[in-house]
Amino acid sequence: MRIIFAGTPDFAARALEELQKAGLDIVLTLTQPDRPAGRGMKMQASPVKILAQQYDIPLLQPETLKSSDIQAQLATFKPDVMIVAAYGLLLPEAVLRIPRHGCINIHASLLPRWRGAAPIQRALLEGDTETGISIMQMNQGLDTGAVLLKRSLPIEPYDTTATLHDKLADLGGKCIVEALTLLDQGRLISEPQNEVDACYAAKIRKIEAEIDWTCDAAYIDRMIRTFDPHPGAFTHLQGNTIKLWQARIVSHVNHNSSHQAGKIITVDPDGIVVACGRDALSIDILQKAGGKKLTAAQFLAGHPLHPGESFHKATQDNQGASET
């Protein structure tokens, strides 16, 4: 089976690695052009490009797939199937028709739940107890194609977007190998998605990561884990932006008055306990703008805090602290 693989970030590279290990015939890899990244804004190759070069797989980096020239070039490879994983470019209908078996997508959710750009973050933020990988036949819609294979995994109470990403990337690689094996055997069954159950995972906006302390502690805890590693859940204190990276729910603390939300209840090297709309959070790891991530004990050694002080949103900050 002749395969074109299209993907860009680490999530896609792990799938490419699994396909390569399985000995499948990858005739071409597509990935986005090199982009400036990092503090020095130097041009960097994508993880998929690096891996393709490591395995000497032919590589193309088009800016778009809309041109007839690139479409004609893809057709010369006579692909049986194109595998797409977090590629980042739109696939025109003409491209979808090139492979004999069409284009198959590796999507990081249990479709039809969480179609769209940020399925991992949305599942975590909304408190889903499980997520998974859907192998989907691509069409012109946004993740609306028939599901060919689906595998689930639990979302653990300690999971962050980073840990969940890694679990799903590994699962995605295994799933696509399984799906292609079934396809080759003529045993891959497609199932249309139920539109009634569909919901969309909109792209994450930075402003969503600002903590509203009137929310309950369980939701704020999920925020902290959802926005790890990017952009980092943040709040404000004494004119400074503070990012929170790890916290624990303190359920035996009960605060019914909304004006208490964000107030520091106790200050302890083991954690800074802050009142929420319901229950409280013990902040274990935090970071001042421009600084390093610190445990509560390390932070307090250089930034003494006292019960009664309050974390709050930027709109409550007279000094107008900016986001980082």
Swiss-Prot record:
Signal peptide: none annotated. SUPFAM superfamilies: FMT C-terminal domain-like (SSF50486), Formyltransferase (SSF53328). Coiled coil: none annotated. Pfam families: Formyl_trans_C (PF02911), Formyl_trans_N (PF00551). Its EC number is 2.1.2.9. One of its GO terms (molecular function) is methionyl-tRNA formyltransferase activity. Keywords: Protein biosynthesis, Transferase. It catalyses: L-methionyl-tRNA(fMet) + (6R)-10-formyltetrahydrofolate = N-formyl-L-methionyl-tRNA(fMet) + (6S)-5,6,7,8-tetrahydrofolate + H(+). Residues 305-324 are annotated as: Disordered. (6S)-5,6,7,8-tetrahydrofolate binds at S109, L110, L111, P112. GO terms for cellular component: cytosol. Attaches a formyl group to the free amino group of methionyl-tRNA(fMet). The formyl group appears to play a dual role in the initiator identity of N-formylmethionyl-tRNA by promoting its recognition by IF2 and preventing the misappropriation of this tRNA by the elongation apparatus. Belongs to the Fmt family. This is Methionyl-tRNA formyltransferase.
